[in-house]
Amino acid sequence: MRFNELQPAKGSRFAGKRLGRGIGSGLGKTSGKGHKGQKARSGGYHKVGFEGGQMPLQRRLPKRGFRSLKKLGTARIRLSELQKIDAEVIDLNALKAAGLASERAVAAKVYLNGTISKAVTLRGVSISAGAKAALEAAGGSVEE
């Protein structure tokens, strides 16, 4: 087989509709658009969500909630992920260096998920009550 002999698999490709090419094609004359009207014109169609002047659904329904910017800037860390870090003292910079927190994070919080057997010191990182108890049971400590 040569490059010039390559062909797509049977049925994988099909020709597009040829519009306005005679009455026998089934898509001649008006090209499947019917007679007159907005939708028959070139570029003639309503915008997405337009309901003919009726108040559209996305405007009838009430707004709800918001995206907390505090949440976007806070990295959420599992307790078990602290095992991967070699440092004795773990702060936000250590979490960023280990790839556990994004570079844009301005704060971090450790949650109880998994276990920890290594004694580490958390500095400047908030921690949930359950995770704090597990960390202190493993011999670690938390500094504010």
Swiss-Prot record:
GO function terms (MF aspect): rRNA binding; structural constituent of ribosome
Region spans: Disordered: 1-57
InterPro entries assigned to the protein according to its UniProt record, in alphabetical order: Ribosomal_uL15, Ribosomal_uL15/eL18, Ribosomal_uL15/eL18_sf, Ribosomal_uL15_bac-type
Keyword Hydrolase: no
Gly residues bias spans: 21-31
One of the GO BP terms on file: translation
SUPFAM superfamilies: Ribosomal proteins L15p and L18e
Record keywords: Ribonucleoprotein, Ribosomal protein, RNA-binding, rRNA-binding
GO annotations of cellular component type: cytosolic large ribosomal subunit
Biological function: Binds to the 23S rRNA.
Oligomer status and interactors: Part of the 50S ribosomal subunit.
Family: Belongs to the universal ribosomal protein uL15 family.
Name of the protein described by the UniProt record: Large ribosomal subunit protein uL15
Species: Dichelobacter nodosus (strain VCS1703A)
